Amino acid sequence: MSSYFVNPTFPVSLPSGQDSFLGQIPLYTTGYDALRHFPASYGAATLQDKSYSSPCYYQQSNSVIACNRASYDYGASCFYPEKDLASVSPSGSGKHRAQDDFFSSDQHYKPDCAQNKILSEEGNDRKYSTPIYPWMQRMNSSSSSVFGPHGRRGRQTYTRFQTLELEKEFHFNRYLTRRRRIEIANALCLTERQIKIWFQNRRMKWKKENKLLNTTESNSEEAEDKTGE
């Protein structure tokens, strides 16, 4: 087995009086050195390898730089939007490009806002332009303020329960105090105005009925008197 390392047990003789120089060279060093561990005949090959390894190292360094550069470009493309790549670029026109992209984005969003505004205005116009027919009006609402087609307030309709309770109250009291009117309005889910108007109308109806009764009674009495004579 051949070895390129120097064996300390065997003396080594070099031509041209290099023995004294060989004794000064340490056999085992702390670092790796091809010139110290290889014979002189392999010095040229070692130099060639060393010279060949330098471009390899240079290529490796280039590859490392290329990898770093590629990762930097990839990071820039990932973490920055397209409009911000111009600001990341080393050229001085990046700021202007970023501003141009910013203004272009504003101009791009303005038509959308205008379209939404137009659509909302059209929806409001349609909402207000919807015709209201008489059959669509609610007349039985307690707080209704809907007027009829001739500008008059629509007639209030009462439920059967409300009419029955109001008739009972009118049978006992033809005139209500304000306190009693408020109590009835809260009990029947009506307003004071509606209670007041109903009692006014009911009194007018009662007077007409009494007037008719009085006239019929007087007429009947006159007829009896005439027959008695």
From Swiss-Prot:
It is found in: Nucleus. PROSITE patterns: ANTENNAPEDIA, HOMEOBOX_1, HOMEOBOX_2. A motif (Antp-type hexapeptide) lies at residues 132-137. Residues 219-229 have a biased composition (Acidic residues). GO terms for molecular function: DNA-binding transcription factor activity, RNA polymerase II-specific; RNA polymerase II cis-regulatory region sequence-specific DNA binding. Residues 210-229 are annotated as: Disordered. CDD domains: homeodomain. InterPro entries: Antp_homeobox, HD, HD_metazoa, Homeobox_antennapedia, Homeobox_Antennapedia_CS, Homeobox_CS, Homeodomain-like_sf. It comes from the Eukaryota. Residues 151-210 bind DNA. GO terms for biological process: anterior/posterior pattern specification. The keyword Membrane does not apply. Sequence-specific transcription factor which is part of a developmental regulatory system that provides cells with specific positional identities on the anterior-posterior axis. PANTHER family: HOMEOBOX PROTEIN HOX, HOMEOBOX PROTEIN HOX-A6. This is Homeobox protein Hox-A6.
